[in-house]
């Protein structure tokens, strides 16, 4: 019994003793009390520290700043968004006021529609924002009249202003008389449709209309998805300023005609003769609006305007260049075949146009470096040599007569050339000759072309310009076997002789005190009729004495009795030319000994002219003096 009592007491004691759960709860409770004590202590400490800071001025300032930061941080985000939305709405309203299509709407548009209309409006104005393309742009240094004359001169036409409502001509320049043969007073105030071809009136009315200035795209509201109805009413005041126009039309041309009365058919003839001809006019311009007061119009005389802007077409009319009147005889005039070449002062080709290949069959590189005299017919050399001298001495253009030019297959083609020389403005010397060569057809050659003035009759050949030996037979031109005849062998030297002649005249005239500042273009080297050379030989008009122009003779008196000149002051004072007989002699009796003798004489002459040698012995000269 005693043992049972001990077991029961132990069990009760175990049951009454605290378990692990009670220990955990007791521990948590103790820790919670400690934490609460710590929090209360920390808050109390912070409050005490803040109370101490309030007493300190520096701490009070920090406390105020801290409170301000807390207040700004607590500001509602909705207020910031509200201010942003207000700014965006104000900008969209301002944009809608700038777009004309938005202003014309009867109700307020949503934001997306306003933005889309603004984009469409910017697309229509693309390319017209450049200030240099605006209609109001004008250089500051030009007046209105000067600018108008410059535009008319550049356009080669006439300026006209036409009202878009009735087609009334409000202004036309005086240059319209050159094209239409109507004066300025005849056209101003009249209807443009009265001067148009009946079949072109509808086309011009379409160009004057303003149908294309209305919006072509249908606007859709972003909210409802329905098309937006615009309140824009088409009218003259809604024309798009700067709308370009370009069209062709036929206008009446008041050409004077002689009336021929026929008794048999009086009615038909009068109708045909009185019928006015038409010319094709290319009109380019733009539509523009002006106030009526700016145009100088009286509003009382125009009751339909009602104070609105006057819409006009400002354009320049030019005669269509492709419309060429055909000649009366029925022949079709085509553009003449021509090519341009440039020559050195001695006649050698330095540039040839590519069109020469189709005319002459030569490639440009085949002609470069060769003399033009090698291709001239021998009967035309005299005339062309005289033209060569003239073009080197004058500033004017020289037009040659018709001459024959040898082409690649050996035959000849008839050409006519315009020559002019280019003078270097600094050195005052001729640098090259420009030649425009035109092919002359057979019918033009027979009937004559009024565009090319004919020069005086030239000699048949160069030999007719030169003095032949007294009583001697006429010299025959040498021919080369295998080469077609017609050209002169060795004719390339002629251009070099003429160039040396002109240069020598320029040097002698330029060295004299009385002719300082003279240029080769102002020298007249053609001697008077029957002029005598220093040696006593007679020079025909346009002829040349048989003396070498390259022979620069000494200024001292020559003691050699074989030398024909005794007065050294008159040496080369006149026109020293080289005869073509010298070329023929050189061609016929050319030998190494003669060439060496000629070179020796030339070198002696050069030394004598420079004062380096004594009298020159002409006994070995192969040419007769």
UniProtKB/Swiss-Prot annotation:
SUPFAM superfamilies, A to Z: HLH, helix-loop-helix DNA-binding domain, PYP-like sensor domain (PAS domain)
List of residues that carry Phosphoserine: 17, 78, 90
Covalent cross-link Glycyl lysine isopeptide (Lys-Gly) (interchain with G-Cter in SUMO2) as placed by the record, residue numbers: 259
Region entry Interaction with CIART, spans: 507-587
Disulfide bonds: none
Modified residues (Phosphothreonine): 21
Biased segments, Low complexity type: 17-32, 510-520
Site (Important for interaction with CLOCK): 125
Glycyl lysine isopeptide (Lys-Gly) (interchain with G-Cter in SUMO2 and SUMO3) cross-link, renumbered residues: 252
Modified residues (N6-acetyllysine): 537
Species the sequence originates in: Pongo abelii (Sumatran orangutan)
Gene: BMAL1
Domain bHLH: 72-125
Protein name: Basic helix-loop-helix ARNT-like protein 1
Compositional bias (Basic and acidic residues): 51-60
Motif placement: Nuclear export signal 1: 142-152
Classification via CDD domains: bHLH-PAS_ARNTL_PASD3, PAS
Coiled coil: none
Keywords: Acetylation, Activator, Biological rhythms, Cytoplasm, DNA-binding, Isopeptide bond, Nucleus, Phosphoprotein, Repeat, Transcription, Transcription regulation, Ubl conjugation
Location relative to the cell: Nucleus; Cytoplasm; Nucleus, PML body
Domain PAC: 400-443
Region (Disordered): 1-60, 454-491, 510-594
Motif extent (Nuclear localization signal): 36-41
